[in-house]
C-alpha cells in the first residue's frame, strides 16, 4: 500500500538549528567568563526580572499560604501518580510492567531494542579487537536486529583481519572498511545500502568523538568519549611495582591519556614516580612515545591524609577506569560513587576489563562518570511508557488535566480533557 501525505510540513524541527547553535554558543561563552553576574544580566535582558535568583524558604512558605487550595489539590493529584509510576519503574527496572495508578488508570513500560546499531571499532594506532567484542556482542544480546561494524582499513588490506573475524563472530550483520569521520557519517546516513543507524557506539580518536558529538540528535550515541583515563587509589599496603605498571599500561594508549595516582603514602608515591619512567623506557617505540608524553603532560600523583580524602578527590575526577589497591577494599567499594569501571584489589587490572574479563570497556571519560555509566545492553534498548484508562477514570484525570493546563495557559490542552468529559457525561 502506497503512503500518501494529505498534508506535509514545509519545515522540520531542525530548520532553525544553525541559527540557534550560534546564539547558544555565544551565550555559553559569555556565562563561562562572567559567571553568576552573566546569568543575572541575561535574565534581566531576556526575562525582564531583576529579583533574587535563589528562591528563599520564606518565598516558598508565602506561596504555600496564598495559593488556592484547588490548585494545590490538582498538583498533589499529579504528583501522587507520577511518583507512583516512578516507584514502579524503579522496582521493575529493566523489565516490562503495567501498574494501576488509580481506579481505571493503568500505566506501564515496554523495553524495545533499537532496530539498527552502528559499532565503531578503532584500528589506527592499535588493532582494537576487544572493541568489536564489547560493542557488537552487547548490541546483539540487547536484541538489535541489524548491527553494522566499521573499522579503519589499511592500504591494500582493508580492516584488520582479526577485527573482521571478531565482528563476524560476535554477530555483526554488515562490516565496512571505513574509519574516522566517513565511518560515522556512513552509519548515520544509511550509506552503502544500509539503514541509518539509530545509535552509534564505540571508542575512537578525537575526530571520531567530534563527529559523534556533532551528529548527536540525528543519531543516538553511547557517550561523549575523550582520551582514556586511569585513576589508582593506593595506600602503604599497595605494591609500587604493580601500581607503576598499571599506570603505564593505560598511558600507552595515547599522548593525551591522563594517569592519576591518589595515595596516603609518600613513600609509595616516590617509588612509583621513580619507576614509571623506567618502565616507559623499556617499551617498544610507539607505546613508549605515547606513554612518555601522557605521563609527562597528563600524569598526576596526589598525596592525601586519609582514605576519605582519596575517595573524595577520586570522585571529583570520576576516572574512566579506577583501581583500588588498599587495605580496606570493601570500604572503598561502598564509598566511591563516580567512575566508569571499578577494579577492586591488585589481583585485577584495567587490561583485564579492556580485553576479556567480561565488563565493558566503552566507558565515560572527562568526568562523565558523575552522571553516566559505560556501554551496557540498556544503551541499545528504549524504555517506552504507555497508558490506558477507562471512561470512568476520566472524571478525575480529565478534570485535573484540564485545570492544570489552564493554570499553565495552555487552553488547547485543556480542551482535550473537556471534550472527553463532555462525551462521557462528566462536568469539567
From Swiss-Prot:
GO CC annotations, alphabetized: cytosol
Active site: 320-321
Keywords: Metal-binding, Oxidoreductase, Zinc
Alphabetical GO biological process terms: L-histidine biosynthetic process
Cofactor note: Binds 1 zinc ion per subunit.
Keyword Zinc in record: yes
Cofactor: Zn(2+)
InterPro entries the record matches: Ald_DH/histidinol_DH, Histidinol_DH_CS, Histidinol_DH_monofunct, Hstdl_DH
Domain of life the protein comes from: Bacteria
Enzyme class, broadest EC rank: oxidoreductase
Positions annotated to bind Zn(2+): 250, 253, 354, 413
EC number: 1.1.-.-
GO molecular function, one term: histidinol dehydrogenase activity
PANTHER family assigned: HISTIDINOL DEHYDROGENASE, HISTIDINOL DEHYDROGENASE HDH
Family stated for the protein in its record: Belongs to the histidinol dehydrogenase family.
Protein name according to UniProt: Histidinol dehydrogenase homolog
Species of the source: Pelagibacter ubique (strain HTCC1062)
Amino acid at each position: 500500500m502506497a503512503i500518501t501525505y494529505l498534508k506535509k510540513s514545509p519545515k522540520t524541527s531542525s530548520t532553525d538549528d544553525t541559527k540557534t547553535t550560534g546564539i547558544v554558543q555565544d551565550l555559553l561563552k559569555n556565562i563561562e567568563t562572567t559567571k553568576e553576574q552573566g546569568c543575572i544580566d541575561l535574565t534581566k535582558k531576556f526575562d525582564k526580572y531583576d529579583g533574587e535568583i535563589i528562591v528563599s524558604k520564606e518565598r516558598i512558605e508565602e506561596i504555600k499560604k496564598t495559593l488556592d487550595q484547588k490548585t494545590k489539590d490538582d498538583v498533589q493529584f499529579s504528583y501522587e501518580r507520577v511518583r507512583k509510576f516512578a516507584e514502579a519503574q524503579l522496582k521493575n527496572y529493566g523489565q516490562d510492567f503495567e501498574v494501576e495508578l488509580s481506579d481505571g488508570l493503568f500505566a506501564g513500560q515496554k523495553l524495545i531494542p533499537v532496530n539498527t546499531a552502528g559499532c565503531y571499532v578503532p584500528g589506527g594506532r592499535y588493532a582494537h579487537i576487544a572493541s568489536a567484542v564489547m560493542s557488537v556482542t552487547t548490541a546483539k544480546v540487547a536484541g538489535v536486529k541489524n548491527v553494522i561494524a566499521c573499522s579503519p582499513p589499511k592500504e591494500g588490506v582493508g580492516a584488520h583481519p582479526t577485527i573482521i573475524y571478531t565482528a563476524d563472530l560476535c554477530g555483526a550483520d554488515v562490516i565496512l572498511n571505513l574509519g574516522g569521520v566517513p565511518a560515522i557519517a556512513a552509519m548515520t546516513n544509511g550509506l552503502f545500502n544500509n539503514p541509518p543507524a539509530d545509535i552509534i557506539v564505540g571508542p575512537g580518536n578525537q575526530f571520531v568523538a567530534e563527529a559523534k558529538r556533532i551528529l548527536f540528535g540525528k543519531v543516538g550515541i553511547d557517550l561523549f568519549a575523550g582520551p582514556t583515563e586511569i585513576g589508582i587509589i593506593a595506600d602503604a599496603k599497595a605494591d609500587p611495582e604493580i601500581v607503576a605498571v598499571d599506570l603505564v599500561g593505560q598511558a600507552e594508549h595515547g599522548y593525551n591519556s591522563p594517569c592519576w595516582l591518589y595515595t596516603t603514602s609518600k613513600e609509595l608515591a616516590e617509588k612509583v614516580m621513580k619507576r614509571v619512567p623506567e618502565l616507559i623506557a623499556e617499551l617498544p617505540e610507539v607505546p613508549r612515545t605515547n606513554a612518555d608524553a601522557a605521563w609527562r603532560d597528563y600524569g598526576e600523583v596526589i598525596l592525601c591524609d586519609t582514605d576519605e580524602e582519596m575517595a573524595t578527590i577520586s570522585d571529583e575526577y570520576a576516572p574512566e577506569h579506577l583501581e583500588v589497591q588498599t587495605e580496606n577494599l570493601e570500604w572503598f567499594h561502598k564509598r566511591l560513587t563516580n567512575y566508569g569501571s571499578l577494579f577492586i584489589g591488585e589481583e585485577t587490572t584495567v587490561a583485564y576489563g579492556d580485553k576479556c574479563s567480561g565488563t565493558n570497556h566503552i566507558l565515560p571519560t572527562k568526568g562523565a562518570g558523575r552522571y553516566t555509566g559505560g556501554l551496557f545492553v540498556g544503551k541499545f534498548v528504549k524504555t517506552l511508557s504507555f497508558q490506558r484508562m477507562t471512561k470512568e477514570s476520566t472524571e478525575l484525570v480529565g478534570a485535573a488535566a484540564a485545570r492544570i493546563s489552564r493554570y499553565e495557559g495552555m487552553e488547547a490542552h485543556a480542551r482535550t480533557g473537556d471534550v472527553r468529559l463532555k462525551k462521557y457525561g462528566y462536568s469539567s
